[in-house]
């Protein structure tokens, strides 16, 4: 029987999630897109009709400027994005998906569907709403830095 201490359960949950995300990421060909790169690809796809700048990705993912810079470099190296001059103001650089990035966004969708199905398949809407409220309170507690 697993430990019922909430902190121990969270640690176990995080470990198990990391393992499942890794396994399903490999199965769907998105092992390096299961984290921030994947979220950035989806954000770019959802905003293809707009100019998206590095600062927009930083804000959306709630990560620091240096982390965003490294993320952009990795994504460029992996061929998922290009950083090109803005069409409005050439001084600014916008981030656009490459054809590979667009194709991988579909794989990310399939991965997200699979992971959501595995996690939430036999949990009722009511249970999800209750757990959502509990997680919201936990997040609020963690975000309150005193």
Question: What residue spans do the PLM features occupy?
Answer:
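Generic structural concept
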Residues: 11-14, 41, 98, 132, ...
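N-terminal leader segment of winged-helix/HTH proteins
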Residues: 1-31, 78
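N-terminal helix-turn-helix DNA-binding core of bacterial DNA-binding proteins
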Residues: 22-64
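Alpha-helical linker/hinge and terminal dimerization helices associated
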Residues: 10-13, 17, 21-24, 61, ...
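C-terminal regulatory/oligomerization modules of transcriptional regulators
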Residues: 1, 125-146
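Charged, amphipathic alpha-helical coiled-coil/dimerization segments
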Residues: 73-132
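Short, hydrophobic-biased segments on the C-terminal half of alpha helices
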Residues: 54, 72-73
């Amino acid at each position: 029987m697993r430990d019922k201490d909430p902190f121990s359960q969270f640690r176990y949950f995080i470990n198990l999630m990391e393992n499942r995300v890794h396994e399903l990421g490999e199965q769907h060909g998105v092992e390096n897109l299961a984290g921030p790169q994947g979220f950035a690809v989806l954000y770019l796809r959802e905003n293809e009709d707009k100019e998206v700048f590095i600062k927009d990705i930083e804000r959306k993912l709630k990560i620091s400027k240096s982390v965003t810079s490294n993320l952009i470099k990795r994504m460029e190296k992996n061929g998922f994005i290009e950083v090109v001059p803005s069409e409005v103001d050439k001084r600014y650089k916008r981030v656009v998906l490459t054809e590979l990035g667009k194709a991988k966004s579909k794989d990310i969708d399939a991965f997200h569907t699979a992971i959501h199905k595995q996690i939430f398949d036999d949990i009722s809407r009511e249970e999800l709403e209750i757990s959502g409220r509990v997680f919201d309170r936990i997040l609020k507690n963690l975000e309150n830095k005193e």
